[in-house]
Amino acid sequence: MENFQKVEKIGEGTYGVVYKARNKLTGEVVALKKIRLDTETEGVPSTAIREISLLKELNHPNIVKLLDVIHTENKLYLVFEFLHQDLKKFMDASALTGIPLPLIKSYLFQLLQGLAFCHSHRVLHRDLKPQNLLINTEGAIKLADFGLARAFGVPVRTYTHEVVTLWYRAPEILLGCKYYSTAVDIWSLGCIFAEMVTRRALFPGDSEIDQLFRIFRTLGTPDEVVWPGVTSMPDYKPSFPKWARQDFSKVVPPLDEDGRSLLSQMLHYDPNKRISAKAALAHPFFQDVTKPVPHLRL
């Protein structure tokens, strides 16, 4: 750790404090994540170390690069490449004008490329949200914290006792499904796509049941026809209110037909029918995709 000079605290992630730091030997600016684990007494689980070490192999232009893993007396530091801003801050800064559609399209395309790459290596994210999508001044967007959920679990609260958001969580997880797939990340990205377009969260639930009911009120309460097996999921209740599905033109009014078609496939209830990242990249919505540069206020 003595090789790094902390420059400033840049945030508080799910697992610990994140610092902007400088490598004293190379001058490289990095993001330093200090991982706080409940197992402070026993040290860092070897399974977590193994999982994290595998992530160093995930090299892709749309994945935040894990440069190093530093394990010293019961603490774990992850050294990542540094990016200027996260998508949440960028959306907040663009709240009045909105993000231009060509930039939304570029961001979604890049994120799907990153997901397709990770999913092809059987790595899930499980906790995608605007706060862990990072952008730079050149128009790139990258997925951060990939694979950390598998190494450390997804806590209910962060180490500072903040509630971990449910807004982007797939319905199969909310319904208690223990075995889920890459489709959970596509759901999260669909919610983020809608949020970039409308400038507000699609399903801003404040509890698991509120989260489910917000989804049901928009997409209709799922049944065996749209989602075979749903009624036998651990947390499914026959007493759930029966809501009808809303028209997507009312849900995301600014989007054209291609955009609505892609979004509805990303938000398919049945994870087996939900579009894959690879298939989404070939969707007509992206036939005119470009790579514009954002106006970042840093």
Curated annotation (Swiss-Prot):
The active site is at 127 (proton acceptor). It holds the Pfam family Pkinase. Changing residue 14 to A: 2-fold increase in activity. Its main location: cytoplasm. It comes from the Eukaryota. ATP binds at residues 10-18, 33, 81-83, 86, 129-132, 145. Binds 2 Mg(2+) ions. Phosphorylation at Thr-14 or Tyr-15 inactivates the enzyme, while phosphorylation at Thr-160 activates it. Phosphorylated at Thr-160 by CDK7 in a CAK complex. Phosphorylation at Thr-160 promotes kinase activity, whereas phosphorylation at Tyr-15 by WEE1 reduces slightly kinase activity. Phosphorylated on Thr-14 and Tyr-15 during S and G2 phases before being dephosphorylated by CDC25A. It is an enzyme of class 2 (transferase). The keyword Metal-binding applies. The modification N6-acetyllysine is found at residue 6. Induction: Induced transiently by TGFB1 at an early phase of TGFB1-mediated apoptosis. The modification Phosphotyrosine is found at residues 15, 19. The record marks 9, 88-89, 166 as: CDK7 binding. It catalyses: L-seryl-[protein] + ATP = O-phospho-L-seryl-[protein] + ADP + H(+); L-threonyl-[protein] + ATP = O-phospho-L-threonyl-[protein] + ADP + H(+). GO terms for cellular component: Cajal body; centrosome; chromosome, telomeric region; condensed chromosome; cyclin A1-CDK2 complex; cyclin A2-CDK2 complex; cyclin E1-CDK2 complex; cyclin E2-CDK2 complex. The keyword Ribonucleoprotein does not apply. Its cofactor is Mg(2+). Mg(2+) binds at residues 132, 145. GO terms for molecular function: ATP binding; cyclin binding; cyclin-dependent protein kinase activity; cyclin-dependent protein serine/threonine kinase activity; magnesium ion binding; protein domain specific binding; protein serine kinase activity; protein serine/threonine kinase activity. Found in a complex with CABLES1, CCNA1 and CCNE1. Interacts with CABLES1. Interacts with UHRF2. Part of a complex consisting of UHRF2, CDK2 and CCNE1. Interacts with the Speedy/Ringo proteins SPDYA and SPDYC. Interaction with SPDYA promotes kinase activation via a conformation change that alleviates obstruction of the substrate-binding cleft by the T-loop. Found in a complex with both SPDYA and CDKN1B/KIP1. Binds to RB1 and CDK7. This is Cyclin-dependent kinase 2. It comes from Homo sapiens.
